[in-house]
Amino acid sequence: MFLRGRSPSGPTDEVAGGKGRCQPDAVEPDATALRQHLRNIVALEKACVYGLLRLDEAERMPDATAYHAACEAQLVVQARLSRVIEQTAALAPTSTAGLLCYCEILRFLVTTHQEGEASQGLSDIAGTYAESVRDLLPRLCAPPAGARAPGHAALRDAYLITLARDARQMLEAVPEEASYAEDEVRLHGMLADIALTIPGTVAGAVALATLIGACLDRRDAFEAMPGFLPLQLNLIDAVQDLLDAAVAGIDGAPVRMPPS
């Protein structure tokens, strides 16, 4: 099956052109490598979309040679995209700049992903991202001694953390073959409730990342579930905001540019 992504325009061009948040002043080795992966992924995704247009045109031609050539070219591009995604999933970020760049990579892949379709590459990258957030974010965003998160954010995230814990427990209790069982429907409902809140604290972001990682480990094709897109976007937004605040200082204004 050919990859059918959304037309790469708007924010995609901004990311590819280097105007996104994935362009910190400091040069970190992991960020340098991830920025190159991001450029490659964007370019190959565009090539896939344009290749599909060529396929549609070739299919209407009386000569089958053009269609077969377009098919072969599309398969080559998709194979290259799969390899780059596989390489990206194997490259976990180790710095603030690297984690911010991984945010942009995952945001691009999630927003070009056809909801309801499974994607092993997306699943692998989402798993690496969730693990990186869980392990790296507390260290990168460690507050000064005595500093506390705003009260409303801590209270809001306390409820999210409880929901995430309950969802993980339900996930472990539901048999994998019970795809349409009552418990599975309840799990989907809990994920939808969790998606209503963007974490505002490190603890909340880590809880959400841990839940996403558990879902990816426990559920085949979790990225095809209805709740995948909002959960991922919420986590990306939360991580970017927390890292921006850490870079700017506890009392500083966020430095991330709003989406165009």
PLM regions: where:
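Sequence/structural signature of long amphipathic alpha-helices
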Residues: 1-260
